[in-house]
Design a protein with these regions (language model features):
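Gly/serine-rich nucleotide phosphate-binding loop at the start of the catalytic core
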Residues: 1-101
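Positively charged, helix-rich recognition surfaces that bind polyanionic ligands
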Residues: 4, 17-20, 24-28, 39, ...
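Short linear motifs in intrinsically disordered
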Residues: 9, 132-147, 167-168, 210-213, ...
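A generic secondary-structure signal for well-formed alpha-helical elements
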Residues: 48, 52-59, 112-119, 219, ...
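Stable alpha-helical structural segments in soluble proteins, enriched in small hydrophobic residues
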Residues: 55, 104-115, 427-436
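Long, hydrophobic, amphipathic alpha-helical segments used as structural scaffolds
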Residues: 56-59, 63, 112, 116-123, ...
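Acidic carboxylate diad motif detector
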Residues: 72-181, 343, 360, 364
Length: 487
């Protein structure tokens, strides 16, 4: 006869934590390093670039000679030997810490994994530009020094002052990424981890509030829903004066570059003659101070425009995600739409200058970033992101369904040649996009479920976000700021 054993049921977790999940989010802060820290940041970034390129060369050579694939674990263990190498040890062993170099190899490994998964192209070399970045994976601390400024402690850099314009979410700082942009400004992104619950409120079958979003060159965003709300949203990224100054600086840079190249060609000819005579070669000319100054001013102007574009994208995407439970976008392949029209020697392109101007206008408006950020925020709020085929949206009448390119009278005027319906051309396209998304969604899948569609149908990113939570969803938990404990 078998002996019975007592069984104690597992203790149930608190109700408030039954649906708790770990989420991660990052906040970006402007940093104000000392002169010594400024030099170290450039050295850290340059060392990471060197290690990343060295790791890529090792992987490429192993594949070329038919050897086994070099893994991240193998390369990360070789960091110590590399730092002790006499050839590199004089500068690589001083800075940065080994963990920072290992993070550069982790980024390289992630790039190869994405390539093997068919998501991106083959990893390229990290070129020497004005961008410097590295990631500190541990021992990141914060301490408050004033109501608006905080200091962050990073390995190898010590305490560095940052503009603490918003508190971090969560109590655990997982890593810190330091970025130096070409204009010399430095930013620190703090990645934090927090607990949050999955959204539990159902997605209401309310298609009237669904918004169609049309992206354009003259008007960046045209949004229209079924409740009669219509918006034309635009912002100039460049002022006329900045465009003139940018053009003038780029011309000055090219003149100085051409003069230096011409002088170096003459020096190369002289060196050939000196080599025959057995004389020492002459040194080539480096960048002049005037050329470097022009490049710094160009970088400053472009950084200013880039921040304006990012601010515009964040504001518009936040409004769309907050005010509409469904947003419908066109499936625009921006990468291919902005490809060069130069063609090849056998098949040269046409209207190259006009196409280049259109490409600049599309990239200035940030079409891809707008859809990408809106989709992320919709998922964060527990809403739906729909993507529909793009052909014909600008020449289709939403009233009668007639398709005719003659209906597009001008850039801003749409008059249907069949029923006479009149509307702003961009708002008309937004209405067509909205109706197309509703029809395809109802015909293809249940809108509440998550579904990854193809080019023949809509893409529905589900109402149950699995990565992030955000304010406004009504499902996030109260997080403890990382600075409150330090204060």
């Amino acid at each position: 006869m078998m002996r019975r054993t007592s069984h104690t049921p597992a203790k149930k977790r608190p109700r408030s934590h039954r649906k708790a999940h770990r989420g991660r989010t990052a906040n970006r802060y402007r940093a104000y390093p000392t002169d010594e820290q400024f030099v170290l940041i450039k050295r850290f970034g340059g060392s990471c670039r060197f290690v990343k390129n060295l790791g890529k060369e090792q992987r490429d050579l192993a594949w070329k000679h038919g050897k086994h694939n070099v893994s991240y674990s193998v390369q990360s263990k070789e960091i110590l030997a590399l730092r002790n190498d006499p050839e590199y040890g004089t500068w690589l062993s001083e800075v940065p810490p080994a963990q920072v170099l290992q993070q550069a190899l982790a980024d390289l490994n992630r790039a190869y994994q994405r390539f093997f998964d068919g998501l991106v192209g083959y990893p390229e070399w990290t070129r020497r530009t004005g961008w410097y970045s590295f990631r500190v994976p541990q021992h990141v601390e914060l301490r408050v020094i004033s109501p608006h400024f905080t200091e962050v402690k990073l390995q190898g850099l010590g305490w560095m002052k940052i503009r603490y314009h918003r508190p971090t979410r969560g109590s655990a700082i997982k890593s810190a990424t330091v970025v130096m942009e070409p204009d010399g400004k430095i930013f620190v992104s703090l990645l934090t981890e927090f607990h949050r619950r999955q959204p539990t409120k159902p997605l209401v079958e309310d298609w009237e509030s669904a918004a169609g979003v049309d992206r354009g060159v003259k008007v960046a965003v045209a949004a229209k829903d079924g409740l009669g709300n219509a918006d034309l949203i635009d912002r100039e990224i460049w002022t006329p004066g900045e465009r003139k100054r940018l053009r003038r600086l780029e011309q000055a840079r090219e003149r100085k570059k051409l003069a230096r190249d011409k002088a170096n060609r003459e020096i190369a000819k002289q060196n050939k003659e000196r080599k025959v005579r057995g004389e020492a070669p002459l040194a080539t000319l480096a960048k002049s101070r005037n050329q470097e100054a022009a490049e710094r001013q160009i970088a400053t102007l472009r950084a200013r425009a880039r921040r304006r574009r990012k601010d515009f994208t964040e504001q518009v995407s936040a409004t769309l995600a907050r005010d509409h439970r469904r947003s419908v976008f066109e499936d625009l392949h921006t990468k291919f739409m902005t490809a060069s029209a130069k063609g090849t020697v056998e098949a040269p392109g046409k209207n190259i200058r006009q196409k280049a101007g259109l490409n600049r206008a599309i990239l200035d408006k940030g079409w891809y970033a707008l859809e990408h950020r809106t989709g992320e925020k919709l998922v964060r709020h527990g809403h739906l992101h729909l993507v529909v085929p793009a052909p014909g949206t600008s020449i289709t009448c939403p009233e009668c369904g007639h398709v005719d390119k003659e209906s597009r009278v001008s850039q801003s005027v749409f008059v249907c040649t069949d029923c006479g319906y009149q509307a702003h051309a961009d708002l008309n396209a937004a209405e067509v996009i909205r109706e197309r998304g509703i029809k395809l969604a109802l015909a293809a899948v249940t809108p509440v479920t998550a579904h990854q569609g193809t080019n023949l149908g809509p893409t529905l990113v589900g109402a149950e976000p699995s990565e992030l939570s955000g304010p406004g969803s009504g499902n996030e938990e109260t997080d403890t700021s990382a600075v409150e404990g330090a204060a």
